[in-house]
């Protein structure tokens, strides 16, 4: 069994909702300016007692409850984040403790920026095949509001906080995964021990050019590997960075826009959390078709990128 099959999801969003109008009172911007350039209307920011770790724990607990599995069934926990509240312990170890996962199983954080969830899938799959076990918990969580300069309109309008979790199992079902990285000075964020002292900065134009090239290529790669077509997929879930990026991808692929899920209008760019948050929304609303494959494609700082095709549980 070489593939991963999605069996359960969970999600968590902070209690504080920030509208474009609220941001227009903080920086020189407007709802029309933000919406026309990004497609974002609202985003969620952590309250004082929330963090990437608390959100991850809530999302993971929901996924575990929905899976019908016991904590002892989880063979590994991988958490993708660039905004962990502590240098150590990792968010994954905090999740392990909170959910009562076995102590003799690996738990670790990784940072591949907005591609992190896809990288996390690869790490989890490798652990299952190398160390044994059937089920993996993969989380993407962020508290990017803690890493932003609230006076920088080029970033504060984009980013939101949130967490998504997914439980995968090894399965002989359609599966493909591709990852890549290209060293580049596109996104910088201060380390967790210096939270807030080195805020996120981004070369938006460079990221846009990179993304509209990388996303279609990633999707073609995993489609070719599985010998599937776009028509075979139930959904294509892109990293939710910017509506215009996804629209360019749709045009390049000559694809049906209805097949591409979007939620950045409500959540903004939640980096590593964006893909699993979207998966959870699709699962909660009954829009994931059991037994049918779907694709996830993402890109992020580094530069990094990735794509995956996998099946939702039968």
What are these regions (language model features)?
Residues 53, 57-60, 64, 83-84, ...:
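Claisen-condensing/thiolase-fold acyl-transfer catalytic domains that form or cleave C-C bonds
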Residues 1-48, 150-209, 213, 217-220, ...:
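Condensing-enzyme catalytic core mediating Claisen C-C bond formation in acyl metabolism
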Residues 40-42, 73-78, 97-111, 145-151, ...:
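Glycine/charged-rich beta-loop-alpha catalytic/anionic-binding loops adjacent to active sites
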Residues 27-36, 86-100, 137-144, 189-194, ...:
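Acidic-glycine-rich active-site phosphate/pyrophosphate-binding loop
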Residues 80, 111, 136-142, 168, ...:
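Short beta-strand segments
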């Amino acid at each position: 069994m070489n593939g991963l099959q999605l069996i359960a999801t969970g999600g968590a969003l902070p209690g504080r909702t920030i509208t474009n109008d609220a941001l227009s009172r903080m920086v020189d911007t407007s709802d029309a300016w933000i919406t026309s350039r990004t497609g974002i209307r609202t985003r969620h920011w952590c309250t004082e007692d929330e963090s990437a770790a608390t959100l991850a724990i809530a999302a993971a607990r929901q996924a575990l409850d929905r899976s019908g599995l016991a904590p002892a069934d989880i063979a590994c926990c991988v958490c993708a984040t660039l905004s962990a509240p502590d240098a150590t312990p990792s968010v994954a170890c905090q999740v392990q403790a909170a959910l009562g996962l076995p102590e003799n199983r690996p738990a670790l954080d990784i940072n591949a920026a907005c591609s992190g969830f896809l990288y996390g899938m690869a790490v989890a799959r490798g652990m299952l095949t190398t160390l044994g076990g059937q089920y993996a918990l993969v989380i993407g969580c962020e508290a990017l509001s803690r890493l932003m300069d609230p006076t920088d309109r080029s970033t504060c309008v984009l980013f939101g906080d949130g967490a998504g979790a997914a439980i995968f199992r090894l399965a002989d079902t359609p599966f493909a995964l591709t990852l890549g990285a290209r060293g580049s000075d596109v996104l910088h964020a201060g380390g967790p021990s210096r939270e807030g002292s080195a805020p996120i900065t981004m070369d938006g134009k460079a990221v846009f050019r990179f993304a509209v090239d990388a996303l279609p290529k990633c999707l073609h790669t995993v489609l070719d590997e599985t010998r599937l077509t776009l028509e075979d997929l139930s959904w294509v879930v892109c990293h939710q960075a910017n509506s215009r990026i996804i629209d360019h991808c749709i045009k390049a692929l000559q694809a049906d826009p209805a097949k591409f899920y979007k939620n950045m209008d409500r959540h903004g760019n939640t980096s590593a959390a964006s893909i699993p948050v979207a998966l959870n929304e699709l699962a909660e609303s009954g829009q994931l078709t059991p037994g049918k494959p779907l694709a996830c494609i993402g890109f992020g700082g580094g530069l990094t990128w990735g794509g995956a095709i996998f099946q939702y549980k039968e």
